């Protein structure tokens, strides 16, 4: 039997043996699609590089080692509210934690959220608001089309529910900190369900942190429903470690005249594969999809995106930038689909990449599929090195070569940082990126919570 088959078989056997336990420690709404998801995973198997969608990241090999799972939901001995120090000072947020893949319910502070807003354990909220969760959970994350999503849906037992009622504006940003902490090599399967009803507005910052003395594998599925006239910002900041592998699938559906900003920033990692699928389902919807990756050593960052212009009069703006050093590898594949009836579409996709060494590798694959004739669509991708003329100019004016290189790299990614609509976060990212380029930011330094 091949290693790949062994990897699949161990989880097939595990689910078959532990399905009752998995369901017992979850909620009915999460259990409802579980059997179908498992069957979809069993049929598809782990993705390999032979599949076009996963050609730049061999997902299957990362599931071959043995990982521990907390299917019995044993409590983790950690008190995040006592030891966590936010990496973004001067930003007042409503702060919540997920420890491994369980929402931390103990010692919750007063969140200060407006009346009717829900932010809490997906498992608990599915028991308190079953009809709400059943209506949305799993409706965007199609397990028949993606094996990682199927795997996550089969094994996920908890996560986060964020619900903002009609016309409610959440002025204070919400911050969710994902913590990976264990004594053995460990796997987590996280789930996030986000619902903004008509006219609602909110901003969410998700921060990923991990301890560095064990190997982690994390799967994550996020579903976002942005209804008519809603406004939503989602920022993801990854500061984990070289021993962390993360597969994150983000699904977004937007209603008419909704405005969504997605910005995923990888400052430090091991292996990261992000899949983002956006459907513009209502006229006048606008998506701004941005990403930034800074990688060195043998780090690997792969972003695969698709934006589906399903109706007329929608706008999409996409901007991804990578800076790769040493033997790091980056990949970007972005599809923009304009359907036959989606006239008056405006779409712009840009991918710019900087390889600081000859050993760094960047793969880029921009794609446009246009089936309407009255549209404005463009895309562009470049892979290059630092501008030698600019370096010469700066050195001629007394700037040391190392400092000149740092300044050029910082200026290169600054465009992505400037899309952030939270000033405190934007200011902090400028500092964190500068420290990263100087080699002063090797991983999360916000607290001792993962130690």
Predicted regions and their residues:
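Short, low-to-moderate order helix/coil transition modules at the start of elongated helical scaffolds
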Residues: 2-221, 228-231
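Conserved beta-strand/loop scaffold segments within soluble protein domains that form the structured core
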Residues: 115-119, 128-392, 396-399, 413, ...
């Amino acid at each position: 039997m091949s290693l790949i088959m062994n990897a699949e078989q161990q989880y097939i056997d595990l689910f078959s043996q532990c399905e009752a336990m998995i369901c017992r420690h979850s909620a009915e709404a999460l259990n409802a699609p579980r059997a179908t998801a498992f069957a979809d995973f069993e049929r598809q198997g782990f993705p390999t590089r032979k599949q076009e969608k996963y050609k730049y990241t061999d997902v299957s090999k990362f599931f071959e080692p043995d990982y521990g799972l907390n299917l019995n939901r044993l409590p983790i001995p950690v008190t995040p509210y006592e030891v966590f120090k936010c990496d973004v000072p001067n930003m007042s947020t409503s702060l919540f934690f997920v420890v491994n893949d369980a929402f931390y319910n103990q010692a919750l502070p007063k969140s200060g959220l407006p009346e009717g807003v829900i932010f809490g354990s997906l498992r608990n909220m599915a028991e308190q608001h079953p009809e709400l969760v059943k209506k949305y959970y799993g409706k965007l994350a199609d397990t028949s089309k993606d094996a990682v999503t199927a795997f996550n849906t089969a094994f996920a037992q908890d996560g986060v529910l964020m619900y903002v009622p009609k016309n409610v504006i959440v002025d204070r940003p919400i911050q969710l900190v994902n913590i990976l902490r264990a004594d053995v090599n460990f796997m987590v399967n996280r789930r996030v369900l986000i619902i903004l009803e008509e006219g609602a507005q909110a901003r969410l910052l998700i921060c990923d942190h991990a301890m560095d003395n064990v190997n982690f594998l994390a799967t994550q599925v996020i579903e976002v429903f942005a209804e008519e006239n809603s406004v939503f910002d989602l920022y993801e900041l990854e500061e984990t470690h070289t021993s962390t592998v993360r597969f994150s699938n983000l699904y977004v559906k937007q209603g008419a005249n909704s405005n969504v900003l997605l910005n995923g920033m990888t400052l430090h990692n091991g292996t990261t594969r992000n899949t983002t699928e956006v459907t513009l389902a209502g006229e006048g919807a606008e998506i701004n999809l941005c990403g930034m990756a800074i990688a060195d050593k043998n780090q690997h960052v792969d972003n695969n995106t698709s934006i589906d212009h399903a109706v007329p009069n929608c706008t999409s703006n996409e901007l991804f930038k990578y800076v790769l050093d040493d033997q790091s590898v980056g990949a970007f594949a972005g599809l923009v689909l304009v359907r036959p009836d989606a006239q008056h579409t405006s779409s712009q996709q840009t991918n710019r990449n900087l390889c600081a060494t000859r050993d760094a590798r960047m793969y880029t694959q921009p794609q446009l599929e246009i089936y309407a004739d009255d549209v404005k669509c463009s895309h562009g991708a470049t892979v290059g090195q630092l501008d030698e003329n600019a370096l010469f100019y700066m050195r001629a004016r007394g700037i040391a070569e190392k400092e000149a290189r740092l300044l050029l790299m910082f200026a290169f990614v600054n465009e992505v940082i400037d899309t952030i609509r939270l000033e405190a976060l934007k200011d902090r990212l400028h500092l964190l990126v500068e420290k990263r380029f100087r080699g002063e930011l090797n991983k999360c330094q916000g607290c001792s919570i993962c130690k």
